[in-house]
């Protein structure tokens, strides 16, 4: 939620988690994490422990069950959560206020130890469900890539070939368009076509080269 203080703490459990069930049937695990800072002493050339911070933590529902099954006294953990302040009435009747950390995540620190994670039944079900959904997503994808994609590509080739052939036919029609089949072809060397050429049909006579008309033509 907005406005909440989220922190991360690294430390050791001071005792085993205490698991209890509240009136609504929800399980809650409570324990304390001791976070001790270490500083370097230049005089002794050694690390020294500073003042420890004891943070009271609470985990709810499935996280509470997992903490009770996994965490033990002295284990070094990394926890993240939200700081919350609550008030309660002590056994002596006094009213007290404490600041607690409501955990969102917690796990073992691997800096000085190793750990092996074992999934619970609820976690396995959710993981397998995600795997099944992933496989289900692969099948439509494969069908689209192999069948739908190839079909579309073949259709594209057909359209390309059809367009290319159609374009070739159109190009042939444009080439034949200037020819008029009803009009005869004009022969520029014939007398019929000499109306616009004048004496072009008599070109080559002796008079054209300065000779007499009685001279034989070439």
Swiss-Prot record:
One of its GO terms (biological process) is DNA replication. Keywords: DNA-binding. Residues 171-185, 192-209 have a biased composition (Low complexity). One of its GO terms (molecular function) is single-stranded DNA binding. Residues 1-110 form the SSB domain. It comes from the Bacteria. Residues 123-136 have a biased composition (Gly residues). Residues 115-150, 166-218 are annotated as: Disordered. GO terms for cellular component: nucleoid. PROSITE patterns: SSB. Homotetramer. This is Single-stranded DNA-binding protein. It comes from Bifidobacterium longum (strain NCC 2705).
